[in-house]
């Protein structure tokens, strides 16, 4: 009993080796090279905000931590076997451990807000926490809708899908911009926010990701060919294909519905779906055109005059 009382009266002890054990699923993924798109974007955004290198490094660490943790959860929710060319973390470490680690890393990232706030005389911790909570809620709202539609086989409209994406994918982009805006020195000035741009960027990024999932060989190597079909996901081109087939091709509609319900891993069947979206419904061409239109809209209306480097980043999203 003395030893128990000693534990109760002393500080809570957590060792470095225990921390390493807990982070194993996270480290499994974070050590695999990703696209680094968000890191590049933060550096480009900082051309408008003028944060210190120390602040930029902290924002980058926080956003990367949230992104990787969300991927751990995503892969469980989507039953994905692969991520970044290796077995998904839950395949290696199990779902319970991976879920716990991902949730833990959300809180670790939140603890970084205190370090960021301390780097400004005003110490805007309350503002940073508000941004963090709002955008994490938005992210989970979007993800929840995406899962609900998939699991109840509720085909969303294109408009509803884009609204969902603005929550799910736009959340981390908005969080990045809003945190950087809270940290910048001096008055904001009229029209100085990049939040509308980050909203559109989230949509552009997700629609492009949906397109590449069905067409890009590099994505096939990292996640498996047309992984969205195996997940039964209502991605942007698949929604368009279903809407087309429902009106113009009942047999094609039945085929698409059947394959999505099967959650098939059969490559031949998935290639038939992709061919249908390419040659019959025109969904891939439609999606590609929408990507180009979104990029043009962002560049012409939402990027400040001095944003040449940001324009280059947007252009990189339209090169297939």
Swiss-Prot record:
Protein name stated in the entry: Geranylgeranyl pyrophosphate synthase
Residues bound to isopentenyl diphosphate: 35, 38, 67, 84
Record EC number: 2.5.1.-, 2.5.1.1, 2.5.1.29, 2.5.1.10
Family to which the UniProt record says this protein belongs: Belongs to the FPP/GGPP synthase family.
UniProt-listed GO biological process terms: carotenoid biosynthetic process; farnesyl diphosphate biosynthetic process; geranyl diphosphate biosynthetic process; geranylgeranyl diphosphate biosynthetic process; isoprenoid biosynthetic process; protein transport
Keywords in alphabetical order: Carotenoid biosynthesis, Cytoplasm, Isoprene biosynthesis, Magnesium, Metal-binding, Protein transport, Transferase, Transport
Reaction catalysis annotation: isopentenyl diphosphate + dimethylallyl diphosphate = (2E)-geranyl diphosphate + diphosphate; isopentenyl diphosphate + (2E)-geranyl diphosphate = (2E,6E)-farnesyl diphosphate + diphosphate; isopentenyl diphosphate + (2E,6E)-farnesyl diphosphate = (2E,6E,10E)-geranylgeranyl diphosphate + diphosphate
Keyword tRNA-binding: no
Compartment annotation: Cytoplasm
Entry cofactors: Mg(2+)
Residues bound to Mg(2+) 1: 74, 78
Enzyme class: transferase
Entry GO MF terms: (2E,6E)-farnesyl diphosphate synthase activity; dimethylallyltranstransferase activity; geranylgeranyl diphosphate synthase activity; metal ion binding
Any GO CC annotation of this UniProt entry: cytoplasm
Residues that hold dimethylallyl diphosphate according to the record: 83, 168-169, 206, 223, 233
Pathway: Isoprenoid biosynthesis; farnesyl diphosphate biosynthesis; farnesyl diphosphate from geranyl diphosphate and isopentenyl diphosphate: step 1/1; Isoprenoid biosynthesis; geranyl diphosphate biosynthesis; geranyl diphosphate from dimethylallyl diphosphate and isopentenyl diphosphate: step 1/1; Isoprenoid biosynthesis; geranylgeranyl diphosphate biosynthesis; geranylgeranyl diphosphate from farnesyl diphosphate and isopentenyl diphosphate: step 1/1
Main location: cytoplasm
């Amino acid at each position: 009993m003395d030893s128990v009382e000693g534990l109760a009266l002393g500080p809570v002890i957590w060792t470095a080796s225990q921390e390493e054990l807990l982070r194993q699923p996270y480290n499994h993924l974070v050590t695999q090279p990703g696209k680094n798109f968000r890191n590049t974007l933060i550096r480009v955004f900082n051309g408008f905000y003028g944060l210190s290198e120390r602040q930029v490094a902290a924002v980058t660490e926080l956003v990367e931590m949230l992104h990787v943790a969300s991927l751990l959860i995503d892969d469980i929710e989507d039953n994905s076997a692969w991520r970044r060319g290796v077995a998904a973390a839950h395949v290696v470490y199990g779902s319970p451990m991976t879920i716990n680690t991902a949730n833990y890393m959300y809180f670790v990232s939140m603890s970084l807000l205190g370090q960021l706030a301390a780097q400004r005389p005003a110490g805007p911790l309350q503002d940073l926490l508000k941004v963090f909570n709002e955008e994490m809620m938005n992210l989970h709202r979007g993800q929840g809708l995406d899962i609900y539609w998939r699991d109840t086989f509720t085909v969303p409209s294109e408009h509803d899908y884009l609204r969902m994406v603005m929550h799910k994918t736009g959340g981390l982009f908005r969080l990045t911009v809003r945190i950087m805006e809270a940290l910048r020195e001096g008055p904001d000035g009229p029209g100085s926010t990049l939040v509308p741009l980050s909203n559109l960027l989230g949509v552009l990024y997700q629609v492009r990701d949906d397109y590449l999932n069905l067409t890009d060989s590099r994505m096939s190597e990292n996640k498996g060919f047309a992984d969205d079909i195996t997940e039964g996901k209502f991605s942007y081109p698949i929604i368009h294909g279903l809407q087309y087939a429902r009106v113009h091709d009942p047999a094609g509609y039945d085929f698409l519905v059947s394959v999505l319900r099967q959650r098939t891993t059969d490559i031949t069947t998935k290639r038939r779906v992709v061919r249908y979206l390419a040659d019959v419904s025109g969904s891939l061409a439609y999606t590609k055109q929408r990507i180009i239109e979104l990029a043009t809209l962002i560049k012409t209306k939402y990027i400040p005059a001095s944003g040449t480097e940001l324009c280059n980043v947007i252009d990189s999203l339209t090169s297939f």
